[in-house]
Amino acid sequence: MSNLKAIRDRIQSVKNTKKITEAMRLVASAKVRRAQEQVLATRPFADRLAGVLYGLQGRLQFEDVECPLLQQREVKKVGLVVLAGNRGLCGAYNSNIIKRAEARAAELKAEGLEYSYLLVGRKAIQHFTRRDAPISQCRDNPEKTPDPQEVSSATDEILAWFESGAVDRVELIYTKFVSLISSRPVTQTLLPLDLQGLEAQDDEVFRLTSKGGKFDVTREKVSVEPEALAQDMIFEQDPVEILNALLPLFLTNQLLRAWQESTASELAARMTAMSNASDNASDLVKTLTLSYNKARQASITQELLEVVAGA
């Protein structure tokens, strides 16, 4: 009987755990939708900003533009901005981004370049701190989806890092959101910016939809058309000053988009992990129930045999 009670308690424990994992899955799926809505809400400003910037680029393409954020230096030290999460229970999300950062650091070391980390997220901070890695700055990753104010603060730190000469190039390592079951760590150069390649960059917007009763993700390419600036347009300020004011905004937008993708990737990974955990819990309950029924049947049979033998 004690064995039957142990199995019954185990079944109840697994059922309670399944309730928790199912709740976490639903919360993560709702937050993924919120992340999508935030991407779409920031899209109009990003499109107009990029359009004006591209228009200025065309206006200044034959001029010698002096802008600190465009200045190409001899690279001796590289700053690596790593976007990770604060919590676990999200599959291999954090370990994949950490492996990518370590692999990039190994590549830079092989090239004879120094490097330093700017870490976002407690998981990355804990990992690299334990290994005495060269860390310049650390930031907590907000539990909610990133807002422009939070990202603007991070951009200011990155700009100060670059403009002070502490690093000669800044690279961003984040997780690109591909689908609800797939994401991949990528590396993107943040600074210095290269105006010659900006007009060729296409953006992407992801949308969370329902398909066949399940969540699905669609992505669409967004090409930004340059803002038409008349050649005889007279600026109240020097166009170079306008460019210097717009580039930090453009950098903030780039960082915001990457941060939103990383957040969506983490939430999707957590949703998948909790869905798998719920499925495993259901399978375990079935197995335990079968074991319970067999043990109960064996117990009843044993009692009958004892009664018959006693008679």
Swiss-Prot record:
GO terms for cellular component: plasma membrane-derived thylakoid membrane; proton-transporting ATP synthase complex. Keywords: ATP synthesis, CF(1), Disulfide bond, Hydrogen ion transport, Ion transport, Membrane, Thylakoid, Transport. Disulfide bonds join C67-C138. It is a peripheral membrane protein. SUPFAM superfamilies: ATP synthase (F1-ATPase), gamma subunit. CDD domains: F1-ATPase_gamma. GO terms for molecular function: ATP binding; proton-transporting ATP synthase activity, rotational mechanism. It is found in: Cellular thylakoid membrane. The keyword Protein biosynthesis does not apply. Thiol-modulation by raising the activation threshold of the enzyme upon oxidation of the cysteines, thereby preventing wasteful ATP-hydrolysis. Gene3D superfamilies: 3.40.1380.10, ATP synthase, gamma subunit, helix hairpin domain. Produces ATP from ADP in the presence of a proton gradient across the membrane. The gamma chain is believed to be important in regulating ATPase activity and the flow of protons through the CF(0) complex. PANTHER family: ATP SYNTHASE GAMMA CHAIN, ATP SYNTHASE GAMMA CHAIN, CHLOROPLASTIC. NCBIfam families: ATPsyn_F1gamma, PRK05621.1-2. Belongs to the ATPase gamma chain family. F-type ATPases have 2 components, CF(1) - the catalytic core - and CF(0) - the membrane proton channel. CF(1) has five subunits: alpha(3), beta(3), gamma(1), delta(1), epsilon(1). CF(0) has three main subunits: a, b and c. This is ATP synthase gamma chain. It comes from Arthrospira platensis. The gene is atpG.
